Amino acid sequence: VFTACDNEDEGLWTHDIPGFEARIIVLDKEGNNLMDPNCENNIIGEISATYNGVTYECEDLFGIYEKPETETRVAYTPFLGLYNAEFKFTPYVGFGPFDGHTEYDNETVTIDLGEGIQHTMSVSNKVKINGKHVNIKRSVTCDGKEAVDTLGITDVFVFIR
């Protein structure tokens, strides 16, 4: 969370609350990452997500984002839907990003991994701003479980197919 103000100005604060995404990795029984476009058996074209009655096919964003030429503290987070990308050189599929300022109350996202395999995500985000103080309560669960840190990625859901 970034805040900006003039020390003399008590009541005028600007808060920039970054967005967030749900991250997914699907491994086969041999441990191959099926979210990797370079994996011969990847399932990127088979998966989809349904949110608010809209079904999203996986967009290919792998390797297209580069660090901006100029540093900024602004967090622009347009909603992209379902996409494959990489985090610290590990391919994954993300859903979102959800706007950090928006309140979500157990919103449901159904992830379809193909072959009749579905998982249900629940997304919550509550932001309370009181002057210069910001309180954020955020949760993304899948089938009732919290995400884990593994394979070099933070907050990711790992499935075996």
Model-identified regions with their sequence ranges:
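Short, solvent-exposed beta-strand/turn "edge" segments of beta-rich domains on protein surfaces
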Residues: 11-17, 34-38, 98-100
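Tryptophan-paired
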Residues: 42-115
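Short amphipathic, basic-aromatic surface patches that mediate peripheral association
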Residues: 26-40
